Amino acid sequence: MFRGAQAINLDTKGRIAIPTRYRPELLAENQGQLICTVDIRQPCLLLYPLKEWEIIEQKLCQLANFDPAQRSVQRVMSGYATECELDSAGRILLSAPLRQRAKLEKTIMLVGQLNKFEIWSETEWQAQIERDLELGLSGELATSDALKMLSL
């Protein structure tokens, strides 16, 4: 499981170093294979261990090609999906189209989301966290049935 948010430098070749604490799990369970794609709702990237991506891929295959909204989700998620492999230094290369889509610059945020990571520009991450906290304080989150059942 991937938890926490960490600032990481993006090198001039477009690589990021995956934090050391995650590498053993990624190597043991996925041989260092990851898939990076865009988030269709947020200005960030989604980084999946290969086994997790294969679950998503099956769900994408089940969407209806003749439904425009479902086809759009398939097109974007699959079209941007890029294989990434941990190198010997624990780095992955983020393709130029992915970096441009998420507006990634020198410092990025790698955010654990339990079964995957989100990759944000530092600026976008700070703005999103502020919006999320404001939403929580406003009480609007309590309108979700799933969240009403969540006990923390």
Swiss-Prot record:
Spell out the InterPro entries in the cross-references.
MraZ (IPR003444), MraZ_C (IPR035644), MraZ_dom (IPR020603), MraZ_N (IPR035642), MraZ_sf (IPR038619), SpoVT-AbrB_dom (IPR007159), SpoVT-AbrB_sf (IPR037914)
Q: What is its main location?
A: cytoplasm
Q: Name one GO cellular component term.
A: cytoplasm
Q: Which residues form the SpoVT-AbrB domain?
A: 5-52, 81-124
Q: Which family does it belong to?
A: Belongs to the MraZ family.
State the species of origin: Mannheimia succiniciproducens (strain KCTC 0769BP / MBEL55E)
- Entries under PROSITE patterns matching the protein: SPOVT_ABRB
Example of a GO biological process term: negative regulation of DNA-templated transcription initiation
Q: What molecular function terms (GO) are annotated for this protein?
A: DNA-binding transcription factor activity; transcription cis-regulatory region binding
Could you tell me the keywords of this UniProt record?
Cytoplasm, DNA-binding, Repeat, Transcription, Transcription regulation
User: Where in or outside the cell?
Assistant: Cytoplasm, Nucleoid
- Binding partners and assembly: Forms oligomers.
User: One Pfam family for this entry, by name?
Assistant: MraZ
The molecule here is called Transcriptional regulator MraZ
